[in-house]
Design a protein with these regions (language model features):
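Radical SAM enzyme core and accessory elements
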Residues: 200-202, 239-321
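Flexible glycine/acidic-rich beta-alpha junction loops that bind and position SAM and/or redox cofactors
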Residues: 59-64, 121-143, 165-179, 208-214
């Protein structure tokens, strides 16, 4: 973690907020190795959210999350994560993991984080790897993953009814409000509204493109110089993908991840079909939870109380005025 750069960046943004008429919100993502008391104090003061990388059970996490000496990180990072979350005093955070072919029973990793470690804001993403890689998810894994998502949804309802709810990022869905149509079709806005900055000052559409010279947008000294690439990303939306035309979930995924599409199809306008299958299942389960809550008076009351305020004006366009 380049903590000095983090501090300087946030301090600079704060110094120009009033002048620019902006409200900057920062999220710190960390694997936990570099967390200190100073980092915790700073993050809890300056960061709207923190994302803490943990793949779940010790043996699962330590399979891939190792330090430079090849040692697993679990035993060192978990106490730091617990300290940070406790110090946040209710401010936003997410435990963010990745599941692979090695742990298609990923609900056990989520339940471990919730029941054994005390975390209740959870996220777990499927790995995106080259086909044939040992960790890559396979077609045979899909039915298992679907069962896991259903198991998770049912367990979340059980926990909610017992008064000990957990949040799963991918089941958060607001059917009453939600984002404007621009956000619904353009997703994360990689390459236009969203960029990755390398330690050397280079600009890329997002962190997954870093190091690929074909996807370098420019640098912090000269700005965006590859305007042709930027314009290509401007057109990277759900309506630019013919395969999305008849998908019922298209306005929830906005066409999916450009980087995943590139890695799967060789084209940022392509469709990563495996990811589509997983995404549709997650939305299906999110809808199932909403229906179950609406049919249970006790759950309906709690759901209304906990409903996220997603209709906040993002300030990106005039359509909300």
């Amino acid at each position: 973690m380049n903590f000095e750069v983090c501090k300087q960046l946030v301090a600079y943004a704060r110094s120009i907020e009033k002048e620019k008429g902006k409200n900057f919100r920062f999220t710190l993502t960390t694997n936990g190795i570099g967390i200190t008391d100073e980092v915790i104090e700073w993050a809890n003061k300056e960061c709207y959210n923190v994302v803490l990388s943990l793949d779940g059970r010790k043996e699962v996490n330590d399979r891939f999350r190792k330090d430079i000496a090849g040692r697993g990180s679990y035993d060192r990072i978990v106490p730091k994560f617990q300290q940070l979350v406790k110090a946040r005093g209710g401010k936003g955070y997410y435990m963010r993991g990745t599941f692979t072919h090695y742990n298609t029973d990923f609900t056990n990793d989520l339940f471990h984080m919730a029941d054994d470690l005390g975390f209740d804001e959870l996220s777990m993403e499927p790995v995106v790897s080259k086909a044939g890689s040992p960790e890559a998810l396979t077609e045979a894994d899909l039915p298992i993953l679907f069962d896991q998502y259903e198991l998770l949804a049912k367990d979340m309802l059980r926990r909610e009814k017992a008064g000990h709810p957990i949040t799963f990022y991918h089941y958060m869905i607001d059917l009453a409000h939600g984002p404007c149509i621009y956000k619904r079709i353009s997703g994360c806005g990689s390459g236009t509204e969203y960029m990755a900055v390398t330690p050397w000052g280079d600009l890329y559409p997002c962190h997954q493109f870093v190091g690929d010279p074909d996807y370098k947008l420019g640098d912090i000294w000269n700005g965006v110089t590859n305007t042709e690439l930027r314009d290509e990303f401007k057109l990277c939306n759900v309506y630019a993908r013919p395969d999305c035309k008849d998908c019922w979930a298209r306005l929830y995924c906005a066409g999916g991840c450009a980087a995943n599409a590139l890695h799967a199809t060789g084209d940022i306008h392509g469709v990563y079909e495996y990811g589509c299958e997983v995404f549709r299942k997650r939305i299906e389960c999110a809808l199932m939870i909403k229906v179950a809550e609406s049919l249970d008076p006790e759950l309906a009351g709690r759901a209304a109380t906990a409903a996220p305020a997603t209709d906040e004006d993002c300030g990106d366009c005039s359509s909300c005025e």
